[in-house]
Amino acid sequence: SMGGHCVTHTCGHDERFFRHLVLVDPVIMDPQLYQSSSRHQYADVSEHPIARRRSHFADAQAMYDRYAERSPYALWNPRVFRDYCDFGVVPREDGEGMELACPPEVEASIYMGNFDSDLYDLIPDIDTPVVVLRAEPRDPESQTMDFTASPTWPQLASQFRHAQDVYLPELTHFIPMQDPQLVADFIIAGASVQPVQSGTE
């Protein structure tokens, strides 16, 4: 998601820190979207659906009970969702229950800022091997924000010098939450890749 966007940005500026990239449904969209004057769907962060998420709960169990049967959480691995509830909230400063560790307004502002972060000038020069895991893409004609669909441009992998495209239509944008072992396997495989040696000894 945004993590994939961030590590791609960092790798594009300094590859010394990377041996292999595993981009899990990264928020790197169709390049045309970054050029569109209407790319900002919401005028203010407060209008973004993420900013309107419920953020206050009596405790982690209350959060679990509220969302366990709802989409997209019902699709997640149960242990992952339990961890999300147990570790994704922190005590409120006023002592009245718990709140999301990442305030919804902050999360929304990060996603809105992404529309001003075009990485396509950096991507073609990245030599680091890349794997792009992506789910079923979003409908470009839809005006509804579907958080389960992939924001990743389907042609993204082809823009890197050395990349593998892994299409996972049976999964949603929440790939690590649904199949953590699959993601772990790709990370383990990437970690075993030997660094490219430049020059001669």
Residue ranges and their predicted role:
Residues 1-36:
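Conserved hydrolase catalytic core segment
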Residues 2-4, 27-29, 89, 136-139, ...:
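Short, solvent-exposed loop/turn segments at secondary-structure junctions
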Residues 31, 38-73:
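The alpha/beta-hydrolase serine catalytic core
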Residues 32-37, 143-146, 178:
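Short aromatic-enriched loop/helix-cap "lid" or pocket-rim segments at secondary-structure transitions
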Residues 78-121, 137:
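Hydrophobic, aromatic-rich cap/lid helix
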Residues 124-171:
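Conserved loop-alpha-helix segment in the C-terminal half of the alpha/beta-hydrolase fold
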Residues 158-201:
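Catalytic active-site module of serine/aspartate enzymes centered on a nucleophile-bearing elbow/loop
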